[in-house]
């Protein structure tokens, strides 16, 4: 065992003749008179973490104080057991680590001190696109295209695997990181050097929360925070409020786990749970499998919570057995949980900040859309919902039902037609009940003579190879294939915007007539412009409903009451729960999990054949458009003085719910964008632009892509969509990138104003890195989403909120104002009040109060050093 803290609380736990040391949280709680059974289970995990990680008695008393008011403003240090990454966020993180080694060398330190101290698993899942679909060889073609496009990135990751300790890469074509984590990587109870403790993690993807369904505490963080955690830095956090959700009853009728999570998302987003833990409890747990729970936990970012936690119970053990975990590990989980009061007790209810109740029997079949995951719509209201939303897309009522011919085809399309139907995302493909349900519905549809409409692009991209194995074993895969839901890849695909191109004739018809067409997907996000640039409307739903909408080909139908085919209704082809359960019982077993995960780190022949150079520091290629040495450390060693921001210009003014997709898009690179110009200047053809997400290892592309989402709306440019602003130095409309570069060249700082929920969505650290490289010094908003706020701080950008009832609208800003932010100094504290002086061109001046949204002393240190990366490197140098 390495460092030993609070040794008086260490005791022995024997499991199958193996002795483990554990930190006795019952004794520690008793010593400070903390009634442990009243504490939420998620906080019990944190209590053990603080105890084990050198927490003083004062640190532990924070939990006792929490029980008095069910909230706290006290800080704790969280030390996760491990880190999970995917390639879109993982590549820039490893680029940062490589750059840190160079920086360490530059200031006279040892580059090898930059090494992960805890296990880091990176799963390559974000790069495969749906180029080929509805064909037997679609999977092979898409894999080949993926390798061709991403060979340089993959060589870099393979280099990282040999250069850094504790760093493993799961090669492409294996699965989605969260499903791989759920089915294989997660241990529930970790053990190292003879010490057993709760498994926990942070991940560079916001849906890291999925594993809370398996009772593993974890959440998404920005890449820069993850890097700090890897290098042994604690994640300082405020002990959160915990919202308890009491579940009763069970799902009935045709309601699925997807319908349940959309209901939970709607309910909790209204409750405003940002920055809070959510914990599920109650008799209803007995009616939810781990797969159901994981679906609910997966969408924690969509309902705004840090995590959605389920305590350990018998379902946890059943799932570990089903997925082929070692018997000794399963026994350790069961014994440890019972010994430490982490096993769910149905007889004793923990105490929560607030309790909400949800009767599972009240959940209805539904979709969510057309542009936010919290906007749930009952299935029989979808058509009306879409028509109600059409004016918001600029479509007049008289044009709603118009149809337009598609060139060289014998069909027409119109507003509301579904052009993408994708069974995608770990949210749902990890759940056998909805996957088997989709396959059974496909079977029955074919038996009734139904076919997918010819304008619908269909795809199946599960999160693990186990899914295709049980579909094959059940004999149901052929029905999905026949409807066009052939395997296209094992990765995120459509859910993250890698939906690939539509039929060119369909694209032409959409563009020519300004159609609002739709995608229906089993994903977790449907933000504007995310799924495909041409599908302005996107609806989330279960895989079963994805198949149903592919058959109908339109949103303009009440599937509950209108026929899909001639005298054929959805109820005629919907599989019963008994049918689904029978297939699951006969087709899913532990041996398939063991087999499919036995060589998870091996990869394909193409992966094995990738050539790399063995070295401890990376040999940067200055001509690369994928991997570049970032400029963050050019001023390493110099002091970053915190001082007032004077004579700043407004770079942009945004409304509510600006997502990290808006700030730093992951999808395709528009041919007219600044990033496209950079790539073209570097002799890259448009066909090879790839996506923003794939080029996150190159800061030149990413800073040009910042605020370049084609659907973003800057209120300074009325009636204009896309990444534009008014450059106040020239009084001209320019791209945000070009204006920012002009301001930087003239030493003019810039700020951003925004509404509520700024930075919601993905854990995208480039949504903070990009603005920092554009010269943004502060973001002033009504509220921030949790991960993005910490990312801004990590990059040295000040997050500030209005006080009272002030908003950007009350201030009547037009973007021509000059901004001073007064009250910033080396003595700033968390939640520091500051003054904002707004000077209009007329000479009128107004001063308002702002609150600095910096929560901890550690975050103050990050600002003082210029960024969390500077802080870590300079601390490690010693």
Curated annotation (Swiss-Prot):
Pathway where it operates: Carbohydrate metabolism; tricarboxylic acid cycle; isocitrate from oxaloacetate: step 2/2; Organic acid metabolism; propanoate degradation
EC number: 4.2.1.3, 4.2.1.99
Single GO MF annotation: 4 iron, 4 sulfur cluster binding
Keyword RNA-binding: yes
CDD domains from the UniProt entry: AcnA_IRP, AcnA_IRP_Swivel
Swiss-Prot/TrEMBL cofactor(s): [4Fe-4S] cluster
Record's catalysed reaction(s): citrate = D-threo-isocitrate; (2S,3R)-3-hydroxybutane-1,2,3-tricarboxylate = 2-methyl-cis-aconitate + H2O
Key word Metal-binding present: yes
Keywords, alphabetical: 4Fe-4S, Iron, Iron-sulfur, Lyase, Metal-binding, RNA-binding, Tricarboxylic acid cycle
Single GO biological process annotation from the record: propionate metabolic process, methylcitrate cycle
Residues binding [4Fe-4S] cluster, per UniProt: 426, 492, 495
Xref: Pfam families: Aconitase, Aconitase_C
Note on cofactor: Binds 1 [4Fe-4S] cluster per subunit.
Subunit structure: Monomer.
Role description: Involved in the catabolism of short chain fatty acids (SCFA) via the tricarboxylic acid (TCA)(acetyl degradation route) and probably the 2-methylcitrate cycle I (propionate degradation route). Catalyzes the reversible isomerization of citrate to isocitrate via cis-aconitate. Could catalyze the hydration of 2-methyl-cis-aconitate to yield (2R,3S)-2-methylisocitrate. The apo form of AcnA functions as a RNA-binding regulatory protein.
Protein name: Aconitate hydratase A
Organism: Rickettsia felis (strain ATCC VR-1525 / URRWXCal2)
